[in-house]
């Protein structure tokens, strides 16, 4: 795992850091950029590592203090037996912010990281936030995502966990990616144990938990989605007083990679015009 992450180029001055959570778990993050600059904290999705945000680390670490977080059971963080539920995952983000000196941050959550970020807000409020960026997951708004059941008929042959994860990783992209990179992502994702991975896919809270959280946020919000969540983005834009939304129609789930230049430009504009001029 560590070898895989070392194969990816790191931003100049990027360093591996660790901290202990309030329940005694050692978690990892990548740190880059000037410590005195505004801090961006990137939270990855289900089973994904911090280094999936490498393009953002490279792009923003010249002018911003960039943190890419490995949640518990992911990347180079410890793999405890418990804590794979929203309250603990939100508390882990709170512990990370405390480890960074209790500074205010721009929190950027992608996929499951959206829910973990909203869990943090639900329990801790927005007092430590400069802004909130949420990428391609439901925020509890209407309409609820539609999940299509498997059509009737013979079940397809069962495949192993490695093949399933490899297929999942490749499904995140609409644009071609290097096979070595995809293999590294798959290898890293498989580090999350099956029981923990399953728990992360079934958080025991109602949809209103996420919706209640996002409507308590008074700081600027940027919500970027792919077309399946366009209606949620439209409703959030209409109902929330401090939100920007966008739909990336040609991107896969990992839109910050598939359309990295567009995303980095949009995030930079959000930082300059909404977050840092409050």
Residue ranges and their predicted role:
Residues 251-264:
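Catalytic histidine-centered segment of alpha/beta-hydrolase-like enzymes
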Residues 47, 71-75, 114, 139, ...:
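Alpha/beta-hydrolase active-site loop signature
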Residues 118-123, 127-160:
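Flexible "cap/lid" loop of the alpha/beta hydrolase fold
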Residues 143-149, 156-214:
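Conserved alpha/beta-hydrolase catalytic His-Asp/Glu region
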Residues 22, 30, 68-108, 112, ...:
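Active-site loop/oxyanion-hole signature of alpha/beta-hydrolase fold enzymes
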